[in-house]
């Protein structure tokens, strides 16, 4: 059984609230989970202390047992210094504007 630390959505329509849970990776996103280890409220300001609340001791225990955090949860854990901060993804060069688009931008601006 592969165990993940991930977000489980709650709240109302257009008012999301997430629980940070430890769950079987094959279980539905909002379905059965093993343990709730924190909360994430994206509706409060970034610097608010209740935006991300973590039970650090329980998370450390699950990480020691081999639970894998999802990308978003890994960022939360990195900011809390529970794991090394994951590397930010660089924008690939192929998505940069091509020569013709750059010429148009120079002409317009």
Swiss-Prot record:
Biased composition (Basic and acidic residues): 100-109
GO cellular-component term (any): small ribosomal subunit
Pfam families hit by this protein: Ribosomal_S16 (PF00886)
PROSITE patterns the UniProt entry points to: RIBOSOMAL_S16
Highest taxon of source: Bacteria
Transmembrane segments: none
Family matches, as InterPro entries: Ribosomal_bS16, Ribosomal_bS16_CS, Ribosomal_bS16_dom_sf
GO biological process, one term: translation
Alphabetic keyword roster: Ribonucleoprotein, Ribosomal protein
Annotated segments matching region Disordered: 87-109
GO MF, any single term: structural constituent of ribosome
Family label: Belongs to the bacterial ribosomal protein bS16 family.
Protein name stated in the entry: Small ribosomal subunit protein bS16
Natural source organism: Rhodospirillum centenum (strain ATCC 51521 / SW)
């Amino acid at each position: 059984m592969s165990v993940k630390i991930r977000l489980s959505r709650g709240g109302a329509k257009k008012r999301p609230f997430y629980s940070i849970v430890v769950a079987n990776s094959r279980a539905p996103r909002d379905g059965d989970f093993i343990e709730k280890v924190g909360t994430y409220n994206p509706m409060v300001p970034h610097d608010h202390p209740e935006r991300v609340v973590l039970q650090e001791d329980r998370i450390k225990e699950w990480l020691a047992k081999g639970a894998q955090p999802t990308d978003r949860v890994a960022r939360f854990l990195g900011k809390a210094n529970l794991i090394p901060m994951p590397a930010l993804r660089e924008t690939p060069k192929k998505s940069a504007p091509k020569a013709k688009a750059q010429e148009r931008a120079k002409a317009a601006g």
